[in-house]
Amino acid sequence: MEDIMTSLLVATSRVVVTISLAYVPVKSAFAAPQNAAGLCSAIAASSIPASRISLPTTGAKIQSATLIGGSDPANQNGEYCKVIGQIKPVDPKAPDIIWQVNLPSVWNGKMLQYGGGGYNGSIPPTTDKTTLGLDVVPTPLTQGYVTFGSDSGHQAPNADDASFAKNDEAMLNYGYMHIKKVLDVAKVLVTERYEKPVTRVYFQGGSTGGREGLTAASRWPESYDGILTNYPTANFVGLRLWGAGLARAVYDDKSAGWIPPKLVERISKEALKSCDGLDGVEDGLVGNMQQCRAQSAVLVQSLACKSDVTGNPDDCLTQAQIERTLKIYHEGYSLPYQLANGINTYPGYNSLEGIMMQLGSEPQMRTPPVSGPNAHHSSRSFEFLQNFVQRDQPLNLLSFDIREPGKLKDRIVELSDVIGATRTDWSTFSDRGGKIIWLQGNDDPSVSPLGNAKLFESIVAKMGADKVKGFMRFFLVPGLAHGGGRFSPTWDNLAALDNWVEHDVPPSNPVVVDATKSSTKGRSRPLCEYPSWPKYKGDGDVAIASSFSCADD
């Protein structure tokens, strides 16, 4: 497998050299002054040669270009040309990259790329608001941004399907290549449509889309000016290994580690009851997470079975559940080898601090595992190990040892660089004025908040706190899960990023509004720069951000 991947990467570098030497500016097929409808129609009849895409392809084709009228009752984004097309692969067996570019008739000179989710497989909603953006703020497209995104180079019925990764080109596209290929295509369309230069390029997304944003800025720092990244799967391979380790902890030895849903819910409620007031107010949110984690051992002891119980009781925790499942869920794991950028740990989750562990409704693991009935991470970890790592050989998830993966170790380490955003030196991006706003939820059950906090700390250790503060802001948000949660922070994040890039005005404890569909909808809190957290001042309306200050004690 490594030889195949290396061959493709070598071929990639050769094609890039050939493209750069052979590049000849292509005369526009649709640049003549026309009205918006005429320009959009001209795009439909065009194509983009491989020479205008900086990574290996066989060119891009336009599938359709449709002018969406500003008076269309189904359109709230103003008049724009909706362009859909394909980037054709080098390998004829690889899937196309399906993309969408939205060209507003009134353009502000800026572009916004949208990231995907899970294993992708479909185009993200490029006409919608940003991830965690305010509903009352006009969409980026309405504001005049060219918005665009892609399926990352394969088509799938859902974001859990990773079968595409058995093809090297499709796997590399998913890992990082689709990001730049689609940007290049979008820039060609922008140049030809408007005949004036792009002033700014931004990227926004959450989860996989958050990882893609960090990847974009770290791999092509000269191409991006600002990134909005939310709960990114930055250590993608580390997360997938954690899911495999969790599966063994839960389902090995006749599922001795499986915790029934009733007990999972009780753990969450007891933790919240114990920790809710540590930030000065009982509001359903745990702000002082550090102190809460310090109390976790007491919580476990209070829920432990009083006698040597076996099986999976729903009223107390057995030793197997404590020593296996809770240990890896709460503390994570360490490896005797290093992934990309020297990482050999994956910290756990706030599983004893109020989040709902996702351990599935069934005590036995299905073959293959399925999210919902089985632990959430087990299914995506199986998909990763089967399709990215093992590929053609059947995989037994419960026999896979993340610490001793044998002959698969080199492949795992290699993939951690291909599909990951854990680099710690951002000097090139920061030196040219690039900015990053990064949100991570403390209640996230899918991406470890401790892991992303540790990555941020590594960036600070590498570059120095003052330099990092000049281009990156990292906010840990109480109550935010993997999107949604007990507190869903929404704000005009694109305006905050643009203001920082354009005017060098960084976001300073910005106010976010809870969009959770519950009785608490509309309450506000300050975003606090890590490691600080929102602490109630002791008086004032608990639903208003001004009643809180950012504390780190």
Curated annotation (Swiss-Prot):
Residues 1-31 form the signal peptide. The active site is at 207 (acyl-ester intermediate), 444 (charge relay system), 482 (charge relay system). Its EC number is 3.1.1.-. Ca(2+) binds at residues 276, 279, 281, 283, 285. Disulfide bonds join 275-292, 528-550. One of its GO terms (molecular function) is metal ion binding. It holds the Pfam family Tannase. The keyword Transmembrane does not apply. This is Uncharacterized esterase Atu5261. Belongs to the tannase family. The keyword Hydrolase applies. PANTHER family: FERULOYL ESTERASE B-RELATED (PTHR33938:SF15). It comes from Agrobacterium fabrum (strain C58 / ATCC 33970). Keywords: Calcium, Disulfide bond, Hydrolase, Metal-binding, Plasmid, Serine esterase, Signal. InterPro entries: AB_hydrolase_fold, Tannase/feruloyl_esterase.
